[in-house]
Amino acid sequence: MSTTLVVDTSVVFGALDAGDPDHASCSETVSAGAALVLPAPVVVELDWIARSRGTLDATSALVNGLLDGSMLVVNLELEDYARAIELVEKYADLPLDLVDASVIAIAERLEQDTIATLDRRHFSVVRPSHIDAFTLVP
């Protein structure tokens, strides 16, 4: 695994919510020692999911993880938004949403080959600009 790991919402939520069916594998993934990078839209989506499921503890745990430095939020730059929209339009049949596209755009900008996600349906189809395909974990 690379020393930096771009993380999608599904893995963060799975790791933070002990009741999630993928909690063990997600926890192992985020505890493996890589620097965890969260694109900023992931933070907002995580809060929305936590609130919709009535598990606000996940939001609190996320914020505490940001405050203690165990996770780093990366803001999107203009070129990331441009790339994300390009991906949303190209993969409209999936459909690929802006949050997932932003995860891909950040991984491309940081030249990362691995993404932590449970969303195989979207991330296994998209072809990144810098490599043939992403390695998906867990």
Which residues does each PLM region occupy?
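Nucleotide phosphate-binding site architecture
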Residues: 13, 44, 124
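A general alpha-helix detector
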Residues: 11, 45-46, 83
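Acidic active-site catalytic centers that drive phospho-/nucleotidyl reactions
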Residues: 8, 45, 100, 119
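Active-site neighborhoods of divalent-metal-dependent phosphate/nucleic-acid chemistry enzymes
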Residues: 72-118
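Short, well-structured N-terminal submotif of metal-dependent ribonuclease cores
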Residues: 1-38, 51-64, 129-130
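Acidic, PIN/NYN-like endoribonuclease modules and their adjacent C-terminal/linker elements
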Residues: 2-4, 104, 108-138
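Short glycine/serine- and small hydrophobic-enriched flexible loop segments
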Residues: 48-51, 108
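Alpha-helix/helix-capping structural signal
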Residues: 10-11, 41, 79, 121
